[in-house]
């Protein structure tokens, strides 16, 4: 049974690390029930989704992340015309957002990112640009001889609306030193998103879990996100991302050592703990039908999640690492999946404003 004082702190938005560790020892469905009650109080029974398009413009990358299956030595780099074609398809499908990210090209300068933004805004100024991770921003800044602040200001001036809060992985340096030693440090990621928020660029917050991380690491990550949000208010959502262990070095090592990927119960516990730790700070917790599958994503709606993500149209990163739930889904199917949980589907925009 969950102690009353832990429940009280959960409803107040002051759950501690110790509380979270205690909750993990509770019978899982009691934990899920508490998270679901907090979700209902925070956001009600609406479940949101977005009609969007994912565009991964290159899989060429100088990075050395051990969890990546997307990077390819042969590689591709979409031309601006190819990107424009994909944006046109997004427009025709009714997308309100394009999410554009790519690998770290050697010596890429900010000009490419500006050209990509202009490719969207020149023809479809109404489409929201949700583009470029904190890692990409830092990479472009360094190659261009600019500060991160100058880079963010330039991107915003050329049409950047919001940023994905990817490249966070686990915000614990001892974990990052194993899984992505050449990536941003914990503090560099924090500094980049904090600066973006203060410049008026909202971001999402993500967490990729289930590799070499512990529950303590995951809790510390979520509490770090909470601290940033208390300072800036710039996160629109929190998105847990379950590690996909196929076709990458970390996954191969896990299999050799007989360590299994996340169980479904672990995935659902993540949503519950995130909802409880982030209560009163971040309202929107997104589940991933791509990574979890449609049925487990439905279950996440009973464990604290309130958003089903996007239609995507294409998805390369998770599918290359073993995700088998598809790369695209229609708005109609998303609504059907949501209604099956006795919740009300609501189409939203990137900033969680209702469209219909």
UniProtKB/Swiss-Prot annotation:
The keyword Iron applies. It comes from the Archaea. It is an enzyme of class 2 (transferase). SMART domains: Elp3. InterPro entries: Aldolase_TIM (IPR013785), CofH/MnqC-like_C (IPR045567), CofH_family (IPR019940), Elp3/MiaA/NifB-like_rSAM (IPR006638), F420 (IPR034405), FO_synthase_su2 (IPR020050), rSAM (IPR007197). [4Fe-4S] cluster binds at residues 61, 65, 68. One of its GO terms (molecular function) is 5-amino-6-(D-ribitylamino)uracil--L-tyrosine 4-hydroxyphenyl transferase activity. CDD domains: Radical_SAM. Keywords: 4Fe-4S, Iron, Iron-sulfur, Metal-binding, S-adenosyl-L-methionine, Transferase. PROSITE patterns: RADICAL_SAM. The keyword Metal-binding applies. Binds 1 [4Fe-4S] cluster. The cluster is coordinated with 3 cysteines and an exchangeable S-adenosyl-L-methionine. Pfam families: CofH_C, Radical_SAM. Its EC number is 2.5.1.147. It catalyses: 5-amino-6-(D-ribitylamino)uracil + L-tyrosine + S-adenosyl-L-methionine = 5-amino-5-(4-hydroxybenzyl)-6-(D-ribitylimino)-5,6-dihydrouracil + 2-iminoacetate + 5'-deoxyadenosine + L-methionine + H(+). HAMAP family: FO_synth_sub2 (MF_01612). Belongs to the radical SAM superfamily. CofH family. Catalyzes the radical-mediated synthesis of 5-amino-5-(4-hydroxybenzyl)-6-(D-ribitylimino)-5,6-dihydrouracil from 5-amino-6-(D-ribitylamino)uracil and L-tyrosine. Consists of two subunits, CofG and CofH. This is 5-amino-6-(D-ribitylamino)uracil--L-tyrosine 4-hydroxyphenyl transferase. The gene is cofH.
